[in-house]
Amino acid sequence: MELKTGFGSSVSLLLAEGDKPEKRAVEELKGMMELEETVERMKVCGGFFGKPDSTFRKAVVTPDFHKGAGIPIGTVMMTEGFVIPQAMGNDINCGMRLYTTDLREDEIRSSLTSLLPEVRRIFFEGGRNIPMNGIQREAMLREGLTGLLETCGEAENKGIWGFYDRDVQERELNYTAFHGSVKADDTEGLRDFIGSPHTLSYDDQIGSIGGGNHFVEMQKVEEIYDGQTANAWGIKKGGILIMIHTGSLTIGHQSGRINQIITKSMYPRGVPHPDNGIYLLAQPGADVRDGKESAWNRFWNTTNNAADFGFANRMFLGLMMQGAVTGVLRPHEMKLLYDSPHNYIWKKEIDGQDCFIHRKGACSARGMEEMADTPFAYYGEPVMIPGSMGSSSYLLKGMGNQEALWSASHGAGRRLSRGEAIHGNDREFQAFMEHFHIVTPIDPGRNDLKGRSDILKKWGESIRSEAPYAYKDIHKVVKVHETHRMAGPVARMEPVFTVKA
């Protein structure tokens, strides 16, 4: 399906057959594409672009396309000579992390009455225990997982660091996009977060899930579709996996605010500002006196601070789950299959030109050729597509479809807004809750909460906003990936229990 933009181009909508795109999302997409007019305006006024061939090259939307904030979720754009900071959202390096384990379903289910309280304690009741000093936090923000690897001795195995194995973490860099490290030369605006260089302290960010559709979930492999790939990746029917979905939280939102200040400061004076509020940041050219290089470097530094935090946050959430399960059951094997962002800007050379792939709520789905010199060279990039809370999730392998800008969905995509979902079908919601195991900061079964209808009402609304009926059918979404040769299914998973903040 092609959507004409009114500016001489079109956007490819890779949607399920018969799936009518959300009207509000389509209107938002049309408004977003007014940025083509902004590009032409910048060319006419002169001096804005540092590269002579700067252009907007292509846009597609993935099957989980739905309304966002200015730019729809599921949007992928390719530009040359400039970036669009808003096109990766503010939760920079929101992404997915997936572990295989040697755990068995029977031992998990038989221990839920003791395991779920321990998970709640570690995630929400003061058991997180991730002490870090300023040296570590700065290394994390500048170099991501590599920075933590180089400074892990500072914490002396305290708290969750007791589950941090340096050799394992070094090996897992090969199973993480960008090796878990996108370099930054500065930590603008983050001095208070970093803290004292040599004093161990705690913060309320690292090891946090965040709100919305973020989660940590223990899953059972229900069905295998590609036996060869599944075997190579350690995926077995009935096996237990741990999937993590979160990002850079407050760090990312602060970086997003700084990036908006940077982009607006570089907008030419006397030129009408874009009606859609979407600004461009030009890549610097040969003339370094025009301030473009400084703005460009600031942008990438603050973006990469957040991205590096996102990688570290998902890693620590994995260690926290490992700690909870080990404390109740037994020491167990956890192997990282892959960690991949779905809110970021990728640099890619195409036809000899440096281009930028912007993904907002869309993940990379490179094929075998693009994954050469990685552990996935013979299969394609792992793609994790979770369904709504309580429904199936899928593991796929990327097929490197250039028409889809080497991209795939990052989820099922909303069908109802959060407000609409809160007023969903009561009977359907109750049936869902009867068999669904969820861990949240609030335990609704606590005796002291039975008389607090206000707290329980708010808790129920937060769960309803993410209930299955609020999202599109994940099976149809995955089928579109097959049809358009974006990614091929490897396995389907079902939740055992879910952790939501």
What are these regions (language model features)?
Residues F82-G89, C94-D102:
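N-terminal cap/recognition module
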Residues E105:
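Patatin-like phospholipase
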